[in-house]
């Protein structure tokens, strides 16, 4: 390969620079504090997504419950999605589901 930098080398270098120069560390600490406070106050964490992001939301919900001990939920049940979409419109189903299930102290 020699001393030539490859596309991948440059890409990784760019990512490192962007991470170092970003607010990622500060934001991660703030997010961790939010999660800890939610857990201490018996709050829940709701994950939501559309399409493939619904799978990510489902996976994150399990990870946060299992690994962090924070009760986490997602709205990936077909009957809930179709019921709320039918009654309130597809563009409103998540909002309406949160209005029904979210309690004070929960985070989304």
Q: Where does each model-flagged region fall?
A:
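Generic N-terminal amphipathic, Lys/Arg-enriched alpha-helix
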Residues: 1-23
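Short, functional N-terminal and low-complexity linear motifs
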Residues: 1-4, 29, 60-66
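Short, structured helix-loop boundary elements
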Residues: 5, 25-28, 91
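Hydrophobic packing residues in well-ordered alpha-helices of helical domains and bundles
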Residues: 8, 28-31, 57
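A short, well-structured juxtamembrane/interface segment
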Residues: 20-41
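Glycine-rich, small/polar surface segments that engage phosphate groups of diverse ligands
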Residues: 34-107
């Amino acid at each position: 390969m020699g001393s030539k930098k490859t596309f991948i080398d440059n890409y990784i270098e760019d990512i490192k620079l962007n991470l170092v120069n970003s607010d990622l560390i500060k934001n991660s600490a703030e997010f961790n504090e939010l999660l800890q406070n939610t857990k201490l106050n018996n709050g829940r964490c709701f994950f939501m997504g559309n399409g493939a992001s619904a799978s990510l939301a489902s996976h994150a919900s399990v990870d946060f419950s299992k690994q962090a001990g924070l009760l986490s939920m997602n709205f990936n049940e077909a009957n809930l999605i179709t019921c709320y979409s039918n009654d309130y419109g597809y563009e409103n189903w998540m909002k309406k589901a949160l209005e029904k299930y979210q309690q004070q102290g929960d985070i989304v």
